[in-house]
Regions:
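Cleavable N-terminal export/targeting peptides
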Residues: 1-35
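Gram-negative and organellar
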Residues: 23-312
Length: 312
């Protein structure tokens, strides 16, 4: 059980830091006015996972469980002069399982960003510091620095290219400590402004761990569709996406006597429903298929969730 609960933290942290998320979409929104703005969002909910799994430490329970979830985000944006933007925030998430309480995961993340629009291109840097605690124990600290370039092309295309340097420190598991270098490119194709758009992206990663068996290289491709529409006198938002990662390990994995090879496919869908001006609900579903020549890392999962939230 000890090995299982450690892995779940890593999965949560990588989900927080990886990929184009709504926070990044807002961070890159053009046309910010001078001054300071604040944003807060809180959510509570419940989710069911058909297979409580720990993909990044290669184990799964084969059993499902319910969990209560809590999320909170506080963010401040400061635009001292036109074209210069500073942003800082704190993000917290917590899961509380019904049966597998040893898998209760808390993630704390602080982040800061600075960007300047040079007209030809926007230059920025984003920093993340995250800590994961599982069942009350500190497990993983992750730091990341991500310089980036972005450019808006008219009203139909937005591109963002970035390099990420990441360092992982595992409490009590120094053989898994690692540094990673990644390059990524994301494109936002606006079909009807922000009412309907597509996000296409890719990332290549090289990770070097203390123990050679955990070194790997990977490439990832993703696509996401967002549609806002009116129904029941409300403006609803539908999101759907798919992500595929091919990961090849550089050295022999002792358990199988050969280098590992993983293929991971994740598809998800979500609908956001306003409940007045400040309140909202989210209904989501995610399917994950994890293929590997290491038997304990070969499985699939279904995750459904319902959340209620407030934002200011």
């Amino acid at each position: 059980m000890r090995q299982s609960k450690h892995a779940l933290k890593l999965v949560g942290l990588l989900a927080v830091l990886g990929g184009p998320a709504m926070a990044q979409e807002q961070a890159n929104a053009p046309g910010a006015k001078t001054g300071t703005t604040f944003r807060f969002e809180g959510k509570v909910g419940a989710e069911y996972n058909s297979n409580v799994a720990v993909s990044d430490l290669d184990t799964n329970t084969g059993e499902g469980d319910w969990a209560a979830t809590i999320n909170a985000l506080a963010e401040a944006t400061f635009v001292p002069v036109e074209k210069l933007t500073f942003r800082a925030g704190y993000d917290f998430s917590q899961s509380l399982h019904q049966e597998f309480d040893a898998f209760d995961l808390a993630i704390h993340r602080g982040y800061g960003e600075a960007a300047y629009d040079f007209d030809l291109v926007t230059v920025g840097v984003l920093g993340n510091l995250a800590q994961a605690n599982l069942d009350g124990d500190e497990y993983l600290t992750l730091t990341q620095v991500q310089p980036y370039l972005s450019k808006q092309f008219g009203n139909s295309l937005f591109l963002r290219a970035a390099y990420s340097a990441t360092e992982k420190e595992f409490e009590g598991r120094p053989q898994r400590d690692a540094t990673a270098d990644a390059v990524q490119l994301d494109g936002y194709v606006f079909l009807d402004g922000v009412q309907r758009y597509v996000v296409l992206g890719g990332r290549a990663t090289e990770e070097d761990a203390t123990a050679a068996e955990f070194d790997y290289s990977s490439w990832l491709a993703r696509a996401r569709f967002v549609q806002r529409f009116d129904a029941f006198d409300q403006n609803l938002t539908f999101r759907a996406g798919v992500e595929y990662e091919d990961r090849d390990y550089d050295n022999v994995t002792p358990l199988i006597g050969t280098p590992r090879s993983d293929k991971r496919t994740v598809a998800d869908a979500q609908i956001d429903i306003p409940l007045g001006e400040q309140f909202f609900s989210e209904i989501s579903y995610r399917y994950g298929r994890f293929e590997s020549n290491l038997a304990s890392a070969d499985y699939d999962e279904h995750v459904g969730a319902v959340k209620l939230g407030v934002k200011y």
